Amino acid sequence: MARLSGQSSGRQTGQGTSAEAIRQQREELRRQRELRLQQQQQAERQQQRQQYRTEQSPIVPAATSSSRYSQFGIYRNQPGDVVDTLASSLPRRTTTTRPEVNRTVPRVKKRYRPGTKALREIRQYQKSTDLLIRKLPFARLVREISLDFVGPSYGLRWQSNAILALQEASESFLIHLLEDTNLCAIHAKRVTIMQKDIQLARRIRGQSWIL
């Protein structure tokens, strides 16, 4: 019985050592595979970097300055280069010069066809509803007229909204008056409006005082 138990214990210890050796071998193989994979990745990265550098600088520097000049037409001394007189012996490249422009001749301005700018201004004014008279000069004119009527001792003061309302009404009146004046000029087979056209338009409107 003692002999059998010793044999069984020896088998168990032998099996344990063999399993441990197999585990160590597997671990070593795994480490080797990881190391090879890392080396492959590093090699690929270096190759990509080298390819990127070659793409960024496609011109490969030559060994000497004379060979650089013969290949690429450049001459540049670098540390260790032999100074030669190749560049001085070769003729210089001539640059093409632009013809001189005579500055004394005035530049001709672009001329539009008659009526083009007028139609552009008409479209611009028809699209907008902004005030066409400057606000400050109009306000000064309103204050001046009011002072002429009531005198400076009265102390008349104006609100900005009141002056704005007067300006809106004044511009609307002038626009409609000029529209009627233009119709009177067209009726007279003319293009230019005159004072008599304004007088006729105001007389047709029934306004008593005439310009």
From Swiss-Prot:
It is found in: Nucleus; Chromosome, Centromere. One of its GO terms (cellular component) is CENP-A containing nucleosome. Residues 1-63 are annotated as: Disordered. It holds the Pfam family Histone. Residues 104-207 are annotated as: H3-like. Histone H3-like nucleosomal protein that is specifically found in centromeric nucleosomes. Replaces conventional H3 in the nucleosome core of centromeric chromatin that serves as an assembly site for the inner kinetochore. Required for recruitment and assembly of kinetochore proteins, mitotic progression and chromosome segregation. May serve as an epigenetic mark that propagates centromere identity through replication and cell division. This is Histone H3-like centromeric protein CSE4. It comes from Candida albicans (strain SC5314 / ATCC MYA-2876) (Yeast). The gene is CSE4.
